[in-house]
From Swiss-Prot:
Protein name, as recorded: Meiotic recombination protein P22
Any one annotated GO CC term: chromatin
Coiled-coil regions listed in the entry: none
Biased composition (Basic residues): 152-167
Anything else known: Despite weak sequence similarities, may correspond to the subunit B of a mei-W68/spo11-containing topoisomerase 6 complex specifically required for meiotic recombination. Retains some of the structural features of the ancestral archaeal Top6B subunit (AC O05207).
GO biological process, one term: reciprocal meiotic recombination
Taxonomic lineage: Eukaryota, Metazoa, Ecdysozoa, Arthropoda, Hexapoda
Compositional bias (Polar residues): 168-181
Amino acid sequence: MDRTTVVPSPASTYCSFMGGSQHSPLRRSQRLIDKENRDLQKIPPKSLSPQLFGNTEDDYSELLLQQGKVVHLKPAAKLVPVRSSDNLVHLGSRDKVVPLKTSNRIVHLKPPYKIIHLKSLDEVEKTVKKKNNIQKEVHQRNSQRRSIQCTPKKRGRKPKQPAKKLQSRISTDQLGSTPSPSKLPAKYPAHFVHQLPPAEDSSCATRRRSLSAPAMQLSDLSLTPDEIQTPERRGEIVNKSPSDLDSDVSLNFSLSDSIGEIFGTKDISSILTMQRPRQYILLEEHLPTLATMLNVDLERLRCVLDITQGLSHEQILRFPIKHEEDELEVP
C-alpha cells in the first residue's frame, strides 16, 4: 500500500493542539514557516492590519517587530577642537564711575521728511492768486495804518465853547392852549360823593395870565447857580440823607399831596366811598299801572325792562337819552 500524505485541517490542528497541549508542544513544519514568511514579504507593510488579515497573535507581533526596528545612525565626523588663544587680554575698568545726567527738557523730534501732496496746475494757479491777493490787502492795510500814525494826535482837553442862550420861540398862548391830555373823566357818576373841581377854560386862563403880568421868556425865569442860595454858602451845616445827596432841591410832589389838592383830603378810603344804589322791586302785576302812568305801551315797557336787565351799570350810564323837547321840535 502506498503512503498518502494527509494535509491537516485547521480544525484538526486546533483539536490536536487542544488535546495534545497537555502532553507535548505543537510542532510546525519548516515549509509552513517559509510560506508564511513569503506571504508577509509580498504584502506591503502599510496595508497590514490585524483586523483584515486575521486576528492571530503571531501576525500582530511580527508587524510590531517590523515597525519597531532599531535604526543605527552613522558615526559623526571627528570633532575639531577650537584652539583657544594663549594670551588672555583683560579689559581695564575705569576707577571713576561717571553717572549720566538726565535733562529735564523734553525734546520733541521733528519728522525728517515732509509729506508733499501733488496738486494739479489749476489748483496751483488758484493758490498763487489767493496768496497775491492776500499780500495786496495786507500791504494796503499797513499803508493805511502808517498814514494814520503819521498824523500826530492832539493831546489835551478841547476848549469849552461858550454856552449859547436858548431863546424859546413858543409863545405863552400856545402853552396854555395845548394842555397835556388827562385820563380822568370830566365828571364822575352821581354815586361818587367827592367830585372833581370844575376845570377852568384855557381861554379864560390865558386871559387872566395876560392881564395879570406881561409875558416873560423862559431864560428869564430860570435861575443861575450863582443866584441859588444854599445852606452851605450861608455857613450852615446840614446832614444830608442818602436821597438828598444827588439833588439839593427836590421838586417832585408826592401822590398824597396831589390827591389832597384835587379832592381836598388825602384819605383814599373816603375818596372812594360810594352811595348805595337804590333798589326797586317791580312785580308783573304792577306793569300795567306803570305803563298807564308813563303813557307807554305795555309790550314796549316789557321789552325795555328785558334789555336793561342784560346791561351793566356803566353801559346804562353811557346809553344816550332823548328828551321830550327834542322830539317835539322835530317836524
